[in-house]
Amino acid sequence: MIDKIKQHIEEAKAFNEKNKESLEQFRIKYLGSKGLLKELFNEFKNIPNDQKKDFGQVINTLKAVAEEKVKQIQEELESKEESKGVFGDLTRAAEPVIIGSRHPISIVKNQIIDIFANIGFNVSEGPEIEDDWHNFTALNLPEYHPARDMQDTFFIQTNPDVLLRTHTSSVQVRYMENHKPPIRTISPGRVFRNEAISSRSHCIFHQVEGLYIDKDVSFADLKQTLLYFTKEMFGKSKIRLRPSYFPFTEPSAEIDIYWGLKTETDYRITKGTGWLEIGGCGMVDPNVLKNCDINPDEYNGFAFGMGVERIAMLLYQIGDIRMFYENDVRFLEQFKANI
């Protein structure tokens, strides 16, 4: 009899079913009102006196083992239920992690930054809510200058001197005010213009503008910098600079790259010419240098600017600028970058 009880003790110790149904069956088997321990205690009076001590010890051991096993598994099951409520079911098999991707605008912007960083340009940033001085006046656009009409501006209604910047040239002004030449910096960022939203234009877009100020800077330096950029960005080294007008540069030019006419899309985006405009550039006007406390008799330089969306549309053959702002995951997940 004692050996049989010891066998039950080992079975109770080995029990490890971690579910409520099996645990309840175990409890009833050993601790229930009609369970094994109840039968053994009833049998105690029939045991010879010389065996009662040993018999009582093994019965108590079996009871202690069974009670401890029930308590242990109950605590584990309760802890599991609590973890489900707070953290989810921690026993579920792991699911694959879907890694997001960078926005195409961020991908292209970072590529541009890396290209210019390789030739010594740093990155400068400034506020998107700007004042009239940094956005217009310091850039050779005094009040009532007709060229201000070239940029439809969002003004702050409560303060006409405060506005949403129309270009990142305002960052260049702030940089020149706080740094002495030589200067090599690019200013990426978001800009705002009161334009109708269509497939080709938006009231919010991104620019990257560059500024180089030093002694004896020439237009040839500007051209070589742009040739380097277009070769690195597009794999194309054929460009042309068309005379143009910007208040803050003189002379000024539009930057065109030769895109070619290999596909129907090429004909459409270049209007059959093979040439495509990507930005503007020019030699910094001496008045702009004066406004930033830089002596134009000692220093000169060049500036350039380009739209990030326009470049992204070229690289990825995207026909509608609005797609960048619709947050359509089906569109965004197509773009991958080394993060």
UniProtKB/Swiss-Prot annotation:
The keyword Chloroplast does not apply. Its EC number is 6.1.1.20. It catalyses: tRNA(Phe) + L-phenylalanine + ATP = L-phenylalanyl-tRNA(Phe) + AMP + diphosphate + H(+). Gene3D superfamilies: Bira Bifunctional Protein, Domain 2. Tetramer of two alpha and two beta subunits. Mg(2+) binds at residue 250. GO terms for molecular function: ATP binding; magnesium ion binding; phenylalanine-tRNA ligase activity; tRNA binding. Binds 2 magnesium ions per tetramer. It holds the Pfam family Phe_tRNA-synt_N. It is found in: Cytoplasm. GO terms for cellular component: cytoplasm. This is Phenylalanine--tRNA ligase alpha subunit. Belongs to the class-II aminoacyl-tRNA synthetase family. Phe-tRNA synthetase alpha subunit type 1 subfamily. It comes from the Bacteria. Keywords: Aminoacyl-tRNA synthetase, ATP-binding, Cytoplasm, Ligase, Magnesium, Metal-binding, Nucleotide-binding, Protein biosynthesis.
